[in-house]
């Protein structure tokens, strides 16, 4: 049975913003190591559209960015959206009965399935489907933006904390 994991970069005041958190080389390596073990990823529409940046190679990328793009293209993806009509390679569009689809993925697959996007994570949290939360806490205060938890915070239990690089702390929680 697969485990559903939601993890994102977060400011000290609880906000996520992909433009505010350029990963350090150490954090990028950490993410690459984590990604290699993923079974697949579930994206909300907005996060999927952001990640489509990696569909095409850019000549200015370094070797690590090319590696990430290759991983992105090869990785199975499920995109939850009622407004999209189609998705790119290795992606499946999920428009109806999200709960049944995600429960089916968890039952049929093994390993970890990443959840990307706070709105989708909020919906999956409400359904009791997320098995683990990973908060990558950065020493920055944004003051506004999209919160890590888009709805009421679920009761959680801390299972680990790790320093990644010089200034990012990963907090890992499971539902209490």
Predicted feature descriptions by range:
Residues 1-176:
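Enzymes that bind and transform nitrogen-containing heteroaromatic metabolites
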């Amino acid at each position: 049975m697969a485990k559903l994991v939601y993890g994102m970069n977060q400011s000290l005041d609880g906000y996520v913003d992909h433009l505010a958190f350029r990963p350090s080389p150490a954090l990028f390596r950490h993410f690459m190591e984590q990604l290699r073990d993923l079974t697949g990823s579930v994206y909300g529409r907005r996060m999927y559209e952001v990640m489509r940046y990696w569909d095409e190679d850019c000549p200015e990328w370094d070797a690590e960015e090319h590696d990430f793009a290759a991983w992105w293209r090869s990785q199975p993806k499920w995109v939850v959206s009622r407004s999209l009509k189609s998705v790119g390679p290795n992606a499946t569009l999920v428009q109806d009965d999200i709960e049944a689809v995600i429960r089916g993925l968890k039952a049929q697959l093994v390993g970890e399935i990443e959840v990307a996007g706070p709105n989708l994570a909020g919906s999956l949290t409400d359904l009791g489907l997320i098995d683990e939360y990973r908060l990558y806490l950065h020493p920055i205060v944004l003051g506004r933006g999209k919160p890590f938890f888009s709805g009421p915070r679920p009761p959680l239990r801390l299972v680990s904390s790790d320093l990644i690089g010089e200034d990012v702390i990963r907090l890992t929680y499971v539902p209490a």
